[in-house]
């Protein structure tokens, strides 16, 4: 399994400084609503809802917003019905892309996604065309302050740890099986180790490193998709060469 991508590191840093809080809250509300609809409104018995609530709280979403989203999902309050649709395709340089959406209008969403991909030198594929290149995993980001790699290994060894990425200067990336993400969170809580950005992720088996021109176009495509209102998450197997990294820093 790969996924230790320089692009993934850049995305995490960009997300940490992203000021589009309204857009972020919209995506979080949709995830909470869908989670409550599919698994019930009790986070104690609904891991997906519990994770969505934790993420919302980490991003300072008011509790009233969270509770309204839950009630819309369970039907206690009237709300929009969302369908979850996943699209797959290719971007510049042959990178594979998975786009997860939540929509109340399938026709609008597929038209928007196709338009963005076509406009940015990509192509929309059939279901299954690229998903076989990825594995769904749990991921947590643990800030490096006050914790060592050895401490993390010791705390998480019996809590489902599959991989520990230490390439980021600011945080460790903890990778678990989907079913073990809650156990990893609990182990960190009990050890008094803080974490952030706990989520389900799609991790590529191998990474693709395009040339500088295609890499720049691929970044533009991914960012355009992430800014689409109906898109919840975008995953890719993009890797950036040192040359591309230097051009981004300049």
Curated annotation (Swiss-Prot):
InterPro entries: Integrase-like_N, TACO1_YebC-like_2nd/3rd_dom, TACO1_YebC_N, Transcrip_reg_TACO1-like, Transcrip_reg_TACO1-like_dom3, YebC-like. Its main location: cytoplasm. Disulfide bonds: none annotated. One of its GO terms (molecular function) is DNA binding. Keywords: Cytoplasm, DNA-binding, Transcription, Transcription regulation. Belongs to the TACO1 family. NCBIfam families: PRK00110.1 (NF001030), PRK12378.1 (NF009044), YebC/PmpR family DNA-binding transcriptional regulator (TIGR01033). This is Probable transcriptional regulatory protein Cphamn1_0542. It comes from Chlorobium phaeobacteroides (strain BS1).
């Amino acid at each position: 399994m790969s996924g230790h991508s320089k692009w993934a590191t850049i995305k995490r840093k960009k997300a940490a400084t992203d000021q589009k809080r309204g857009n972020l809250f919209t995506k979080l509300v949709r995830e909470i609503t869908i989670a409550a609809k599919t698994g019930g409104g009790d986070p104690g018995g609904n891991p997906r809802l519990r994770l969505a609530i934790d993420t919302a709280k980490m991003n300072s979403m008011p509790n009233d917003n969270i509770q309204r989203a839950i009630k819309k999902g369970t039907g206690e309050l009237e709300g929009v019905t969302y369908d979850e649709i996943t699209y797959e395709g290719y971007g510049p340089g042959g990178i594979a892309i998975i786009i997860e959406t939540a929509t109340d209008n399938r026709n609008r969403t597929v038209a928007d996604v196709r338009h963005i991909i076509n406009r940015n030198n990509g192509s929309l594929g059939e279901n299954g065309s690229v998903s076989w290149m990825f594995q769904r995993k749990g991921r947590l980001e643990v800030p490096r302050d006050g914790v060592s790699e050895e401490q993390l290994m010791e705390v998480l060894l019996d809590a489902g740890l599959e991989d520990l990425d230490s390439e980021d200067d600011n945080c460790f990336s903890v990778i678990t099986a989907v079913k073990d993400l809650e156990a990893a969170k609990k182990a960190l809580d009990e050890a008094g180790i803080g974490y952030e950005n706990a989520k389900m992720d799609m991790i590529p088996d191998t990474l693709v490193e395009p040339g500088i021109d295609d890499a720049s176009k691929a970044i533009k495509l991914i960012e355009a998709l992430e800014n689409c209102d109906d898109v919840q998450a975008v995953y890719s197997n993009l890797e950036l060469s040192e040359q591309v990294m230097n051009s981004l820093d300049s």
